[in-house]
From Swiss-Prot:
Gene: Ythdf3
Function noted in UniProt: Specifically recognizes and binds N6-methyladenosine (m6A)-containing RNAs, and regulates their stability. M6A is a modification present at internal sites of mRNAs and some non-coding RNAs and plays a role in mRNA stability and processing. Acts as a regulator of mRNA stability by promoting degradation of m6A-containing mRNAs via interaction with the CCR4-NOT complex or PAN3. The YTHDF paralogs (YTHDF1, YTHDF2 and YTHDF3) share m6A-containing mRNAs targets and act redundantly to mediate mRNA degradation and cellular differentiation.
Gene3D superfamilies hit by this protein: ph1033 like domains (3.10.590.10)
Molecular-function GO term, any one: RNA binding
Compositionally biased residues, Polar residues: 15-24
Residues reported in the UniProt entry to bind RNA: K422, S423, Y424, D428, W438, C439, N468, W492, W497
Protein name (database record): YTH domain-containing family protein 3
Residues bearing the modification Phosphoserine: S23
Species: Mus musculus
């Protein structure tokens, strides 16, 4: 479908004009008298059916501004006749046809002299009619002295934007009736190029309204082009559309400002948060209880028993270690460097409170070593490493006398009894191995003594040792004598323990609680064996399972790794004890 584009001239002109249909060759010549009917009733009919060569359908892209021109005031022509007086901009020319406003927005780049205008702006190098016309040359030199004078004056300076009437101080078209619009100053025109606002729409409406007063354009609003009032409705104006995307921006800006722009306020809290979890700004990721740095995260939860030295564990056999914690801290102060590594490796594990010295430098892979011993956190790495390479003389002697960790252990007991022993400190475990003795609380001693006497030599009485909060069992010993309630060993970390009995250590190895947690004791509210108190008896059948796991477990660490460390600490404790005794005298 294509409609013929008619070249029109005023009635006074009798010459023939060419009719173009979007093609290069000319159609039949006709007289302008033949088109009289179209001037009154169907002036805009040709707009209804755009040629198929148009790059888009004008009906889809209706111009937002009316065309304030009249067919009676000037002729339509692309052949270089008198200029067209419509105030909207010229678009790209396609085969001699005008594309008005839509082309001004959507047209493709053209050839030289046919640059598409932007948003209705006049093309400054626009050659109407033929390529001989140029705004830089005089009209006489181009062979269009009079007819193109309006174009020369109009395009020599940028006319108003967006189809507005030419304001004061600018050259007008040949028919100057539309050149000047009252109420629009040159300052207003300049503002239209700076912003798109509601007043611009109003100004355009005024301009278009003035042009529509001409006689020949009565029916233009009925065509595909929407009426002026609906062309730029206030709710859907460009200004309103531009505001919508702008609204979310302020919301995003404050957020960005908080993180970036507001460096003065946010940075301090961020820095504080980062420093909270570190110790001595060493960057150690360990977040051990801030109150007691000595309690770094432990590898395994031996038992839900809470604090380092839980008072409820009155039965813990060696509460003697409570005073020790402060001393070891002093001794081990120079060696805290190894501790951060250990703490980091054991941090992911549950209830990381205390880490055995042997596990601090190398990292305890088996969730072992955590106890209520709060003191030797940093020292162990130094002493542990040498101990692993060089065996302490005392340890060599003990290993020569005793057959630790035997492979032929008979864990399938027919007769016998098994008890859990909880110690406050691994120092006391070291002394128990060294001196082959043990001492529990007053209540614990009575219970163990009664059990030992009840067996009457018919079966062994095994003790399963574990340090509070260590997360592992550290070994198994057999009770070898009744309790001597009046004896005082004088070797424990605390001097308050009274009584002793002999033991023989069979297994000295770290067995993580996760290896035994599945075994539950029916005589202890069905709690796991790892969640037991001092001198808690283990039923024989469950005891067999525990002994089998401990005997067959392939350990990688044991208290023997820290034997030299505990030897040194014992010497320091004895020196301090002698000093106190001298002061008392």
């Amino acid at each position: 479908m294509s409609a013929t584009s008619v070249d029109q001239r005023p009635k006074g002109q009798g010459n023939k004009v060419s009719v173009q249909n979007g093609s290069i060759h000319q159609k039949d010549a006709v007289n302008d008298d033949d088109f009289e009917p179209y001037l009154s009733s169907q002036t805009n009919q040709n707009n209804s059916y755009p040629p198929m060569s148009d790059p888009y359908m004008p009906s889809y892209y209706a111009p937002s501004i009316g065309f304030p021109y009249s067919l009676g005031e000037a002729a339509w022509s692309t052949a270089g006749d008198q200029p067209m007086p419509y105030l909207t901009t010229y678009g790209q020319m396609s085969n001699g046809e005008h594309h008005y406003i839509p082309d001004g927005v959507f047209s493709q780049p053209g050839a030289l002299g046919n640059t598409p205008p932007f948003l209705g702006q006049h093309g400054f190098n626009f050659f109407p009619g033929n390529a001989d016309f140029s705004t830089w040359g005089t009209s006489g030199s181009q062979g269009q002295s009079t007819q193109n004078s309006a174009y020369s004056s109009s395009y020599g300076y940028p006319p108003s934007s967006l189809g507005r009437a030419i304001t004061d101080g600018q050259a007008g078209f040949g028919n100057d009736t539309l050149s000047k619009v009252p109420g629009i100053s040159s300052i207003e025109q300049g503002m239209t190029g700076l912003k798109i606002g509601g007043d611009l729409t109003a100004a355009v409406t005024k301009t278009v309204g003035t042009a529509l007063s001409s006689s020949g354009m009565t029916s233009i609003a009925t065509n595909n082009v929407p009426p002026v009032s609906s062309a730029a409705p206030k709710p859907t104006s460009w200004a309103a559309i531009a505001r919508k995307p702008a609204k979310p921006q302020p919301k995003l800006k404050p957020k960005g400002n908080v993180g970036i722009g507001g460096s003065a306020v946010p940075p301090p809290p961020i820095k504080h948060n980062m420093n909270i979890g570190t110790w001595d700004e060493k960057g150690s990721v360990v977040k051990a209880p801030p109150t007691q740095p000595v309690l770094p995260p432990q590898t395994i939860i031996q038992q839900p028993q809470p604090l380092i030295q839980p008072p409820p564990l009155v039965q813990s056999q060696l509460p003697q270690q409570q005073p020790q914690p402060p001393q070891p801290q002093q001794q081990q102060g120079p060696q805290p460097q190894a501790q951060p590594h250990q703490v980091q490796s054991q941090q992911p594990q549950l209830q990381n409170r205390w880490v055995a010295p042997r596990n601090r430098g190398t990292g305890f892979n088996q969730n072992n070593g955590t106890g209520s011993e709060n003191f030797g956190l940093g020292v162990v790495p130094v002493s542990a490493s040498p101990s692993s390479v060089e065996v302490h003389p005392v340890l060599e002697k003990l290993k020569a006398i005793n057959n630790y960790n035997p492979k032929d252990f008979d864990w399938n007991l027919k007769n016998g009894r098994v008890f859990i022993i909880k110690s406050y400190s691994e120092d006391d475990i070291h002394r128990s191995i060294k001196y082959s003795i043990w001492c529990s609380t007053e209540h614990g001693n009575k219970r163990l003594d009664a059990a030992y006497r009840s067996l009457n030599g018919k079966g062994p009485l095994y003790l399963l040792f574990s340090v509070n909060g260590s997360g592992h069992f550290c070994g198994v010993a057999e009770m070898k004598s009744v309790v001597d309630y009046n004896a005082y060993a004088g070797v424990w970390s605390q001097d308050k323990w009274k009584g002793k009995f002999e033991v023989k250590w069979i297994f000295v190895k770290d067995v993580p609680n996760n290896q035994l947690r599945h075994i539950r004791l029916e005589n202890n509210d069905n709690k796991p064996v790892t969640n037991s108190r001092d001198t808690q008896e283990v039923p024989l059948e469950k005891a067999k399972q525990v002994l089998k796991i401990i005997a067959t477990f392939k350990h990688t660490t044991s208290i023997f790794d820290d034997f030299a460390h505990y030897e040194k600490r014992q010497e320091e404790e004895e020196a301090m004890r002698r000093e106190r005794n001298r002061n008392k005298q």
